[in-house]
UniProtKB/Swiss-Prot annotation:
Gene3D superfamilies per the UniProt record, alphabetical: 3.60.21.10
UniProt EC number: 3.6.1.13, 3.6.1.16, 3.6.1.53
Gene that encodes the chain: Adprm
Protein's organism: Rattus norvegicus (Rat)
Record keyword Membrane present: no
Family: Belongs to the ADPRibase-Mn family.
Name of protein: Manganese-dependent ADP-ribose/CDP-alcohol diphosphatase
Catalytic activity entry: CDP-choline + H2O = phosphocholine + CMP + 2 H(+); ADP-D-ribose + H2O = D-ribose 5-phosphate + AMP + 2 H(+); CDP-glycerol + H2O = sn-glycerol 3-phosphate + CMP + 2 H(+)
The keyword NAD is assigned to this record: no
Amino acid sequence: MADKPDPSSPADGPEPLFSFGVIADIQYADLEDGYNFQRSRRRYYRHSLVHLQGAIEDWNKESSMPCCVLQLGDIIDGYNAQYKVSEKSLELVMNTFQMLKVPVHHTWGNHEFYNFSRDYLANSKLNSKFLEDQIPQHPETTPSENYYAYHFVPFPKFRFILLDSYDLSVLGIDQFSPKYEQCMKILREHNPNVELNSPQGLSEPQYVQFNGGFSQEQLNWLNEVLTFSDANQEKVVIVSHLPIYPEASDSVCLAWNYVDALSIIWSHQCVVCFLAGHTHDGGYSEDPFGVHHVNLEGVIETAPDSQAFGTVHVYPDKMLLKGRGRVPDRIMNYKRE
């Protein structure tokens, strides 16, 4: 695409400290093109794999090689379950990722749970928790096995935290379990509709079945990690499938209890960026506390002649997102101390 400068040369200035790749909502399926539920947006199920291959080729040849790639969830489409090809499609996408020369951190979205149970995912290649960094002197920063979340250090004084935004959810868990009952109760308290995927008439439209939320246990853990990062002057990037900031997202795509997550993040100094997928349209806003909320445009709704991924180049004073195709460039300055 000739309309953008060469993204592999981020700036005519100092070299970045490090870089990382971002991609969201690949939603691959071996199907002809289709449309979203409202039939207003086209989905390129088969071509999403070609887009992924193109992204990997670009990342592999960048002059400043990304240290890792963040895959923001919905790696294969829910249609795969209907046709009983979930494992086959996942294997195809994961084999494509093997061409990448750097590690991939995977978040889980609603389409993961349309295809697989939480137990299956925990034992699959989509569990990238083995890439975590631990802080032995601070056991309170070790996540519980009850949710899929972890943190890692890609570069000194920078910490990335992957959150489980379907920790509270009715998707992918045993319908006879206490957790399912608890989550269904939360959902029905906020959504009286017969069709639980419909936000019609809701004052809090995020309370639909295709979204989820964060348990208090996970939020307490997040608070502990951010407390450690504050004390150690770290800058933190948080990664989640679901967005949490209304100004950067369609309200129907937010995490159920996004307010709880925001209040914890806003009680700390260290968070500089919150990366999410899910919306497909993308979105961006800097909140009043200087946190940059970036919702990445989804691969699944990206035409064959475009692209949808990016590389974030990290500097001492800012992050530069160099987007490809539908993903715009963004300059994200850190808040002044």
